[in-house]
């Protein structure tokens, strides 16, 4: 690893309580705002292509199967990258790891806008997926390092809204760009914005509290659950921690299988939702993408409710809130599918409620993985479940495109309804699991 990418060493520990408190308050706000902005732009460069899909299909640039193939390639590569990057990011300098990854995705989006062949699109989108994996594990590690167990749900939920803001704005940006300049201009705009913010991350983001001379967050907040997690596995090597607390941890595997199904639903609605609106209601690209924006708006609110509720109502136990939201996914998907009449307002409302319920488990499962693992393996644990999440998302690409071609939208909704129902069943063992960490 290049020297500047290595995690910074611990600085001499401060002793002045007032200075420690002041620095913790400043850096906790600063870290959250910085990773929030960075991840929102990761989302811009991840969903730029999806937002342009109706325009690309209308222009005959790619077929529906081509679109599904690119989505599947992206999700598989992104899932693998999240796991590998999670392991690497646990011992890397957060500011450069995340910043360089974002700059790379920006450059690739610009190149995508200049490309014309399916092979060029495929190669560039696989590369984009690889560098996209440099974002989320870093954020998970920093959220675990700067915020303790009994408060983390609320802070993690605030960061998680970056998904929704990025996901809500990029369809509007792409639709406006496509309307006036073509979809390629939208890809280039997203890429340029990502490069600027990536440079900002390299400049202003910081690593763990200990690298700034601060005590661990559990000691600072006197959080017994956090201190207990910090003290687990003392004396183990990184390889032993990874094996015991991630690869052989049954709770991590159960969360992973559940994540597969949650992401089938999330990716299906996110990637095919605008096409569903276009084909069933005959609306234009701007109107169709507005429905996807409602999905993200619902997710924005749902993530905040899920994070706050798991902290305040269940004392940091993510299981009950996860189950409630998983049941909500099934009901809201069924409402969109079985709606007896075609109405933009009602369908957009269903997109909102699906987003509300999907982004609860989307956030809480990743957080639960970090908390069910070792403190020094937070990035690896979230990366591991993320690998399975995007294997699930890949099923919403080419395989779901084939379902659409054969059984049309009825087959589409049958698949995602089954996925939602099974995901709820897999979360039952977590109802009473407060701190399951090892096998």
UniProtKB/Swiss-Prot annotation:
Gene3D superfamilies: MFS general substrate transporter like domains (1.20.1250.20). GO terms for biological process: glucose-6-phosphate transport; phosphate ion transmembrane transport; phosphorelay signal transduction system. PANTHER family: GLUCOSE-6-PHOSPHATE EXCHANGER SLC37A4. Belongs to the major facilitator superfamily. Organophosphate:Pi antiporter (OPA) (TC 2.A.1.4) family. This is Membrane sensor protein UhpC. It is a multi-pass membrane protein. GO terms for cellular component: membrane; plasma membrane. The lineage of its organism: Bacteria, Pseudomonadati, Pseudomonadota, Gammaproteobacteria, Enterobacterales. Residues 46-66, 119-121, 184, 266-289, 344-349, 401-410 are periplasmic. One of its GO terms (molecular function) is glucose 6-phosphate:phosphate antiporter activity. Its main location: membrane. Part of the UhpABC signaling cascade that controls the expression of the hexose phosphate transporter UhpT. UhpC senses external glucose-6-phosphate and interacts with the histidine kinase UhpB, leading to the stimulation of the autokinase activity of UhpB. The chain crosses the membrane at residues 26-45, 67-87, 96-118, 122-144, 163-183, 185-205, 245-265, 290-310, 323-343, 350-370, 380-400, 411-431. Keywords: Cell inner membrane, Cell membrane, Membrane, Transmembrane, Transmembrane helix. It is found in: Cell inner membrane. NCBIfam families: 2A0104, PRK11663.1. Residues 1-25, 88-95, 145-162, 206-244, 311-322, 371-379, 432-439 are cytoplasmic.
């Amino acid at each position: 690893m290049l020297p500047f990418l290595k995690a910074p060493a611990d600085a001499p520990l401060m002793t002045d309580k007032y200075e420690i408190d002041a620095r913790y308050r400043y850096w906790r706000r600063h870290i959250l705002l910085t990773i929030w902005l960075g991840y929102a732009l990761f989302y811009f460069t991840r969903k730029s292509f999806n937002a342009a899909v109706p325009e690309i299909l209308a222009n005959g640039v790619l077929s529906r199967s081509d679109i599904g193939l690119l989505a599947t390639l992206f999700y598989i590569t992104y899932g693998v990258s999240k796991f590998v990057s999670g392991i690497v990011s646990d011992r890397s300098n957060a500011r450069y790891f995340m910043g360089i990854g974002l700059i790379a995705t920006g450059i690739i989006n610009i190149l995508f806008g200049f490309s014309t062949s399916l092979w060029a699109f495929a190669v560039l989108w696989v590369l984009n997926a690889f560098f996209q994996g440099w974002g989320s594990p870093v954020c998970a590690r920093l959220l675990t390092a700067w915020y303790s167990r009994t408060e983390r749900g609320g802070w993690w939920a605030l960061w998680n809204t970056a998904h929704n803001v990025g996901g809500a704005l990029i369809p509007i940006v792409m639709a406006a760009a496509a309307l006036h300049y073509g979809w390629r201009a939208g890809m280039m705009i997203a890429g340029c914005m990502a490069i600027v913010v990536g440079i900002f991350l390299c400049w202003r983001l910081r690593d763990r509290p200990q690298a700034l001379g601060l005590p661990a967050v559990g000691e600072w907040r006197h959080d017994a659950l956090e201190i207990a997690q910090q003290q687990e596995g003392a004396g183990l090597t990184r390889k032993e921690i990874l094996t015991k607390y991630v690869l052989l941890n049954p709770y991590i595997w159960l969360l992973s299988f559940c994540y597969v199904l949650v992401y089938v639903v999330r990716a299906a609605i996110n990637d095919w939702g605008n096409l569903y609106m276009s084909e069933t209601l005959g609306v234009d690209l701007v109107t169709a993408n507005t429905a996807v924006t409602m999905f993200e708006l619902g997710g924005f609110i749902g993530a905040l409710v899920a994070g706050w509720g798991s902290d305040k109502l269940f004392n940091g136990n993510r299981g009950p809130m996860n189950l409630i939201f998983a049941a909500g996914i099934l009901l809201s998907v069924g409402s969109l599918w079985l709606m007896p009449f075609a109405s933009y307002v009602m369908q957009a409302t269903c997109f909102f409620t699906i987003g509300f319920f999907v982004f609860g488990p989307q956030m809480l499962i990743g957080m639960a993985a970090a908390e069910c693992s070792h403190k020094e393996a937070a990035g690896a644990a979230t990366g591991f479940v993320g690998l399975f999440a995007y294997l699930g998302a890949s099923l919403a690409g080419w395989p779901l495109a084939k379902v659409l071609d054969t059984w049309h939208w009825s087959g589409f909704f049958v698949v995602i309804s089954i996925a939602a129902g099974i995901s709820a069943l897999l979360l039952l063992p977590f109802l009473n699991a407060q701190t399951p960490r090892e096998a």
